[in-house]
Amino acid sequence: MGWGISRLIGLKAAVLLSVAYYFHGLGATLISFPLIYASMIAMLVCIASHPAIDLPLLLGKASDGSFPLWSWIMFSPFLLFIHMFVLLRRFVKNEPLYTEIADGVFVGGWPSSVEHLPPCDPAVIDCTCELPKSPTLSNNAYLCIATWDTRAPQPSQIESAVRWAMRKRSQNKAIYVHCAYGKNYFHISILDDELCCFFLCIFS
């Protein structure tokens, strides 16, 4: 599976620390200190998202998709960075946000506005730990299985998501499964009218 997000954020930490060292050498302490803090947070995320550790609970995302105040304060350099990175990447790539891979089953990226949701009032399975639940989803059935980008959910999370999705499909609800960018792979099979979802996240 590779290092994925861990490698990216580790590189970011190194760059921030180098820039902080440069400004510190110029005597610009007020600039270097925030950069050092952002570098420390990035390194913490790098370690927590490494496959050997894989600790998405670090960021404190709740089951309702919200982040507590302490998380916004402590991890603001990372949370704001990833939020802006997702929006910028979406603007630059200009790719379809979601794809219907089976009847009533959609996979895609983080829906930041109502235009980014399939037009069928779907039940939503959120596979991100870095992005908050969008106000767009306030009226949608919602399940959060917090997962680092480019990482796979735990088997117990997959099993829970499968059962939840099967219940929603039995109620004739469409399902929207999303990660941050919509670039993860999702394998779907339908057996005896029961929806079985197997999530395989790969670095892309």
Language-model features, listed with the residues they occupy:
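A phosphate-binding catalytic loop at a beta-strand-loop-alpha-helix junction
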Residues: 172-192
